[in-house]
Amino acid sequence: HPPPVATSKEEQDRLLRDQPDQPQNPKVLRIAIIGAPNAGKSTLSNQLLGRKVFPVSQKVHTTRCKARGVVTYEDTQLIILDTPGLTNPLKAKRHKLKEAMLRDPWDSMKHADLVLVLVDVSDHWTRNSLSKEVLKCLSEFPQIPSVLVLNKVDLLKKKYILLELVTELTEGIVNGKKLEVRTALTHNSGSSSKSPLQVTRASPPEKRAHEPHCLQETDQAQQGSSLDNSSDTRASETRLVAEEAQGPKHCGPRDLKNMKGWPCFQEIFMLAALHGEEVDTLKRYLLMQAKPGPWEFHSGVLTSQSPQEICDNIIREKLLEYLPLEVPYGVIQVTEMWEEGPSGELLIVQNLRVPRKSHMMMLIGRGGKVISRIAQEAGQDLMNVFLCDVRLKLKVEMKS
């Protein structure tokens, strides 16, 4: 089980300052998770950590600064760099984002041993290509091994789309081998037998352009997830097949204008939005990629954030969830009280300052329902992080 986060800043600071309790043969891996805003980076970070310490919401730019999560398992330490979504200066200005939000993903890449590129396949608008910002990031650091993670595959009704997406997002090349989609009609697509990744001659793309596809499980290490198509009575069995490709040996900066995908991914993983099973497969893979080296953190550390930062972020997550449009972005949070109660419970009082009376009414809600719900849900999340009772009181006032 992951350790709880300390409730006092002093205790957390002490843990962060502590010399790591190095095992005999320590191994370490620093992982940058990058992707478009709202791709699910923080959700994945939380799943890998086994405890929710990063804020998550449906709105973009929930993560405002880079924070580190720490997974310590036996002699291995994974350091997860949870970063804001990669965006451009124009969009940053529109969302009133600080300059650090443009800089942080790039800074994370500088310190990473491996990069996970997360793509939300349920988003029709963004799933067919990697954003220019992501491609720019990858081409700037071609020496860092990268892995493609397709997220929310369970929300995709037509599974054959995954094959097209994989081909587009990898430019048809994974781990130096050319991917090919091979289709054969079969009467029973519900078969659970695993089909290995095979090396075969690539067929011309025009031949298979109009054939129906349906994805069966390919090599487990390559995909990290199986997909069930038992609903099709007569479906096509399709395998991703790899052959040696004359792909670029060194992926340096290049003309990104016409690129939609990245031909230097080492692996592909497919994850369901809320299921832990595939995340465990990914976690095992990451633990195997760790290299000998000293731990950065004591094994009692779960995150580099202070308890107050975690609290602010979790309350902010709820504001983003329950307030419309731009309203949550204008709320200023001020912690009035943070202390231990007589029975060891954590007592928190936070002021939420808003610029307009209309915003105040929305935040309080009819009969105080909205603010009560925010306090209740945020309080529960904080209990799960700190593993102690939390009494959270939220007050709403106008900015003076």
Give the predicted meaning of each segment.
Residues 60-62, 84-87, 121-125, 152-157, ...:
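Conserved nucleotide-binding/hydrolysis micro-motifs of P-loop NTPases
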Residues 1-119, 351-353, 397-398:
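Conserved G1/Walker A P-loop phosphate-binding module
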Residues 176-181, 292-298, 325-331:
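Short, structured loop/turn "capping" segments at alpha-beta junctions
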Residues 40-41, 155-165, 188, 192, ...:
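Conserved GTPase G-domain signal focused on the G5
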